């Protein structure tokens, strides 16, 4: 699914001080450790000064490549990025071990270096949280994530669509996962991260670094599902907020969000206001993965197995032999076995084939259990489904 994502910068951080681990959820990568190669910062409240004071690690500086000929390819994903515009993208990139960082709209090389450094710091934490291999490139072992930094982004923290209001987005691109984020030099940085004294210090889950943990988790999930994308919004956002450790808030606020709207709609779309829905998505992942009382105990490190089940069902539904005489769209053969093409590949930017939604539903129903019986996902699957009983289950699970 070519969905768009941004890490909400909650202005009411003091009111949402209960972290996931305090809710029995088993949070993801920690706020410290595995920060290999991290640059250093000087205390400041100004985004521009923060960037100027940032000491880029030598290993990242050595990854700068000039006259780069590769393209930031969005394909038919839902992302509209200025890094895909040859008139606006720089020919200089930072090609780090797990990510290639592009720059649009005059973003500086230092913008790119900071983004590469923070992404590389996030990678081992995400791998640990999901139980992925600690070796190889990116999250699938072979492919670098493509990331665009753009100072024009961040005028708001909207979730979908295009324009400058996006702070971060991730999607399944043609051949590589693509991400775009607000550059650290953005004039909108202070509004998104008010009072920031460092990219990595501050309230865990609300730092600029956590934007990279958040979008990096999306990138990991898309990498594991290549070439199909998909996966419902509640799952994607719940996983990203879990690994990035977004402060969850009170039990009452989570239950109010669940009661206010259907957060697990059968069409897979995001539901409700993201400012309140994020913690509820996070709590739902905690419910599924935690071994605390009321949790289903699936384990966060088993999530890649669930994604593999989804990918297998998507392959079964979407892979067809290329008919004799047909030359399929190249976008439909990316990541497919020889002689097969992906009939579920998006025919228009951002489109999600219904067969992918069905595959996700089937994978969930075949994976998760409750009291020894399959836990069905949607109300259409059964009266005791997660969608139909989410309020009751979270009420029993959250302390």
What are these regions (language model features)?
Residues 127-150, 227-233, 252-257, 296-314, ...:
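Surface-exposed patches in mature extracellular/periplasmic domains of secreted proteins
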Residues 19-22:
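C-terminal motif of bacterial Sec signal peptides marking the signal peptidase cleavage site
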Residues 2-11:
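Bacterial N-terminal signal peptides that target proteins for export
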Residues 44-47, 60-76, 315-399:
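Beta/coil-rich, acidic/histidine-enriched accessory regions frequently appended to metallopeptidases
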Residues 35-102:
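N-terminal low-complexity, Pro/Thr/Ser-rich intrinsically disordered segments
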Residues 224, 229-272:
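Post-HExxH zinc-binding segment in Zn-dependent metallohydrolases
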Residues 24-28:
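Bacterial signal peptide processing site
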Residues 81, 85-219, 223-224:
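Juxtacatalytic substrate-recognition/specificity segment
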């Amino acid at each position: 699914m070519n969905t768009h994502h941004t890490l909400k910068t909650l202005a009411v951080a003091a009111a949402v001080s209960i972290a996931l681990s305090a809710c029995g959820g088993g949070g993801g990568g920690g706020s410290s450790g595995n920060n290999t190669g991290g640059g250093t910062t000087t205390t400041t409240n100004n985004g521009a000064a923060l960037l100027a004071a940032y000491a880029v690690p030598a290993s990242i500086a050595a990854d700068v490549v000039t006259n780069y000929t590769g393209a930031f390819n969005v394909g038919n994903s839902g992302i509209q990025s200025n890094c895909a515009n040859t008139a606006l993208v720089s020919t200089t990139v930072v090609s780090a071990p797990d990510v290639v960082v592009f720059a649009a709209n005059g973003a500086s090389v230092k913008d790119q270096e900071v983004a590469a450094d923070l992404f590389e710091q996030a990678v081992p934490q995400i791998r640990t949280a999901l139980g992925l291999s600690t070796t190889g490139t990116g999250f699938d072992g072979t492919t670098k994530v493509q990331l665009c930094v753009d100072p024009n982004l961040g005028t708001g923290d909207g979730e979908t669509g295009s324009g400058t209001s996006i702070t971060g987005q991730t999607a399944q691109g043609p051949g590589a996962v693509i991400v775009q984020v607000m550059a650290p030099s953005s004039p909108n940085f202070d509004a998104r991260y008010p009072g920031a004294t460092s990219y990595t210090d501050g309230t865990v889950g609300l730092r600029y670094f956590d934007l990279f943990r958040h979008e990096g988790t999306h990138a990991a999930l898309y990498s594991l599902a290549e070439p199909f994308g998909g996966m419902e919004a509640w799952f994607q956002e719940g996983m990203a907020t879990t690994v990035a450790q977004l402060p969850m808030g009170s039990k009452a606020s989570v239950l109010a969000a669940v009661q206010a709207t259907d957060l697990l709609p059968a069409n897979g779309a995001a539901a409700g206001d993201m400012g309140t829905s994020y913690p509820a998505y996070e709590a739902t992942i905690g419910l599924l993965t935690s071994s605390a009382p009321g949790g289903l105990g699936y384990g966060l490190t088993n999530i890649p197995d669930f994604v593999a089940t989804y990918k297998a069902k998507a392959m079964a539904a979407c892979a067809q032999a290329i008919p004799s005489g047909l030359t399929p769209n190249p976008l439909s053969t990316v990541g497919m076995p020889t002689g097969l093409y992906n009939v579920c590949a998006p025919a228009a930017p951002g489109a999600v084939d219904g067969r992918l939604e069905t595959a996700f539903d089937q994978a969930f129903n075949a994976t998760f259990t409750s009291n020894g019986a399959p836990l069905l996902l949607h109300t259409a699957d059964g009266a005791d489904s997660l969608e139909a009983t989410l309020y009751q289950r979270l009420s029993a699970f959250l302390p």
